[in-house]
Amino acid sequence: MSLIDTRIPEPKRFISGATGDWEVVIGMEVHAQVTSESKLFSGASTSFGAEPNSNVSLVDAAMPGMLPVINLECVKQAVRTGIGLNAQINLKSVFDRKNYFYPDLPQGYQISQFKQPIVGEGKIMISVGPDNKGQFEDVEIGIERLHLEQDAGKSMHDQHPTMSYVDLNRSGVALMEIVSKPDLRSSDEARAYLTKLRTIVRYLGTCDGNMDEGSMRADVNVSVRRPGGEFGTRCEIKNVNSIRFVGQAIEYEARRQIAILEDGGSIDQETRLFDPVKGETRSMRSKEEAHDYRYFPDPDLLPLEFDQAFVDALAVDLPELPDVKKQRLVEKQGISIYDASILVTEKAIADYYESVAAGRDGKAAANWVINDLLGALNKAGKDIEESPVSPEQLGAVIDLIKEGTISGKIAKDLFEIVWNEGGDPKKLVEERGMKQVTDTGAIEKAVDDVIAANPEKVEQAKAKPTLAGWFVGQVMKATGGKANPQSVNELVKAKLGIEE
C-alpha cells in the first residue's frame, strides 16, 4: 500500500484525545472471491458448503508434478472489476510465489501477483452521511491495485480435543485482492467504502459479496497521527467479515493507539484480530514486510498477456453500474439523490423498483419500495429476492390509490394482506369491501357527526384553523379509512367556515 497523503485534514473527522485532536488513517485490502465455477489454476469446483476436502484437485493438494493452468474466466472477471473501478488495466501481468508456511497452504507458497498486477490504479466515489442536516458528502477514494491470487485452505481447531484438521476445499479458489490507498479517515468512510465496493462487484457479477460465507473479507490497516502530521505506525486487522465489524474494529483500534501514544508509548507494527463478542482487537503476530515472503516470478506460469481488444470486448458487455444508475433514476424518475442511493445499493432492489415504477409516478413507487417494502423485508429478515410481494402486486396497489379506489391508509392494510396472504390486490379490494367511500352524502354525514360530538373543538378550530386536521383524522377513523381524504378535508373546512 503506497503512503501518499491525498486528503486535506478535516476537523469533523478528528478524534478528541486527552492531549488534543488525532486523525485516523485507514487503508483496506479486500479479498473478494471471484465468481467462477472452477478454481484459479485447477478444474475443481468452487461450490460453498461442500463436504470437507471434496472439492480438491491434485493441483490444489500440491501433488508433485502437477502444474497450474490459468482459468480464463477468472482473468475476465478481474478485468471486468478493474473497469468497474475506473482503473488502469495492465495488458501484461506476472504471477509470483509468496513464500510462507502454514498447514492449510499445501504448496508452501501462495500464487499471487506482486510487482506487476493485472489491474493498476483506479478510484471509486463513496457517499458519507447523512449529517445532522440530512446532507451526504461525496468522497473520492483511490484504488492502488487489484491482483489475482489463490485462497488458502481452512484450519479447523474445534473438531478434536488434541488435533487440528485441514479442509482444502477453499485452497486454490480465485481471489481478487483490491487494495485501497490510505485515503479513508473515519469508520463511517470505511463502512461506506466497503459497502460501495461490494455493490460494484455484485452489479458486475464478479463476486457475490457474501461476507458471512467468507467470499468477501477485509484486512483493515489503521494508524493515527496528529492532524496533518506524518503517517503513524499502522496495525493490520485481519479477516474482518462484516461491514459493521469493520466500523467497530476501526473505532476500537484508533482509541487503543491514541491511548498508548498519549501515555508516552509507541505503536508496534503488528497483525491483529477483531473479537466481535468483546468488541476489541487483540495481537496476533508481528506484521510481516514484503521481503519476508521472498516473492519471485512463478516459473510454472508464463506472464499473463492480452491486448486492448480483449479489454474493450469485456467493457462493452458490462451492466449499468450503481453511480450511473443513480443519476439516471434521479433524472428520469424525479426522485431524490437520497432515495436513489438507497435503491441502487443492491442491483436486485434497483431492478424491483424499476419494475414497479414503469409507467407510474417514480416518487410514489420509491416511497412504497423504500418505506413499506424494504421496511417489511428488514423486519422479517428477508432479502429482496424473498419478497412475498411481487413488483406487479405492489404496482397494482399504487394504481388503486391513483385511481381513487382506495385511500392511502387502506393501501397500507392492503399491502399487509398481500404480504401475508398473497393474491391480486384489485380482487382483494372487491372481495373485502375495501373500496374508498366517494359518496358525498355518506362522507358529509360522518363529518356532521364528528362536528356535533365535539363542540369545544369547533370553537377552537375557528380560532386555530390548523385544528381542521384533527377533524379530518376523526372522520377517517370513523369511516375505517375508507373516506376520500380530499373530500373529507374540503367538507370539514366548509363546515367549520375555514377558508383555504
UniProtKB/Swiss-Prot annotation:
Annotated EC: 6.3.5.-
Self-association and partners: Heterotrimer of A, B and C subunits.
Task performed by this protein: Allows the formation of correctly charged Asn-tRNA(Asn) or Gln-tRNA(Gln) through the transamidation of misacylated Asp-tRNA(Asn) or Glu-tRNA(Gln) in organisms which lack either or both of asparaginyl-tRNA or glutaminyl-tRNA synthetases. The reaction takes place in the presence of glutamine and ATP through an activated phospho-Asp-tRNA(Asn) or phospho-Glu-tRNA(Gln).
Alphabetical list of SMART domains matching this protein: GatB_Yqey
Protein name, entry field: Aspartyl/glutamyl-tRNA(Asn/Gln) amidotransferase subunit B
Domain of life: Bacteria
Keywords from the UniProt entry: ATP-binding, Ligase, Nucleotide-binding, Protein biosynthesis
Disulfide cysteine pairs (residue numbers): none
Cited Gene3D superfamilies: 1.10.10.410, GatB domain, N-terminal subdomain
Alphabetized InterPro entries for the sequence: Asn/Gln-tRNA_amidoTrfase_suB/E, Asn/Gln-tRNA_Trfase_suB/E_cat, Asn/Gln_amidotransferase, Asn/Gln_tRNA_amidoTrase-B-like, GatB, GatB_C_1, GatB_Yqey_C_2, Gln-tRNA_amidoTrfase_suB_CS
Chemical reaction(s) catalysed: L-glutamyl-tRNA(Gln) + L-glutamine + ATP + H2O = L-glutaminyl-tRNA(Gln) + L-glutamate + ADP + phosphate + H(+); L-aspartyl-tRNA(Asn) + L-glutamine + ATP + H2O = L-asparaginyl-tRNA(Asn) + L-glutamate + ADP + phosphate + 2 H(+)
Keyword Nucleotide-binding: yes
BP terms from Gene Ontology: glutaminyl-tRNAGln biosynthesis via transamidation; translation
HAMAP family listed in its UniProt record: GatB (MF_00121)
Gene designation: gatB
Family recorded in the similarity comment: Belongs to the GatB/GatE family. GatB subfamily.
Group of enzyme by EC: ligase
Pfam families per the UniProt record, alphabetical: GatB_N, GatB_Yqey
Alphabetized GO MF terms: asparaginyl-tRNA synthase (glutamine-hydrolyzing) activity; ATP binding; glutaminyl-tRNA synthase (glutamine-hydrolyzing) activity
